[in-house]
Amino acid sequence: KESAAMKFERQHMDSTVATSSSPTYCNQMMKRRNMTQGYCKPVNTFVHESLADVHAVCSQENVACKNGKSNCYKSHSALHITDCRLKGNAKYPNCDYQTSQLQKQIIVACEGNPFVPVHFDASV
């Protein structure tokens, strides 16, 4: 079974590109990473930084998560990310996403030993 840490990597890590220059990036990646199976995941963020840099966020600024838990961490610096948002008229199985390239701080929930990201909470 896929661990929470592995799921985070599948859903949120794309270290192979510095940015998502293509407007079809989200449509391709959401499908490739199995987030359009059975339904269209409405919102997802990909991080274009090294896995080591994203793991390091777990030792940066401790902040509250959206759900009230206290195991979220905010990156010190802005990271290259891509926001994928399902377009209003898109219906499964034709998941059609808006691709937005951003540089923002990220907030992730971390747990385990090693202490690694298991949930993408927000970008700010």
From Swiss-Prot:
Pfam families with a match to the protein in the record: RnaseA
GO MF, one annotated term: lyase activity
An example Gene Ontology CC term for this record: extracellular region
SMART domains: RNAse_Pc
Catalytic site: H12 (proton acceptor), H119 (proton donor)
Tissue: Pancreas.
Glycosylation sites per record: N34
Subunit details: Monomer. Interacts with and forms tight 1:1 complexes with RNH1. Dimerization of two such complexes may occur. Interaction with RNH1 inhibits this protein.
Recorded family membership: Belongs to the pancreatic ribonuclease family.
Entry protein name: Ribonuclease pancreatic
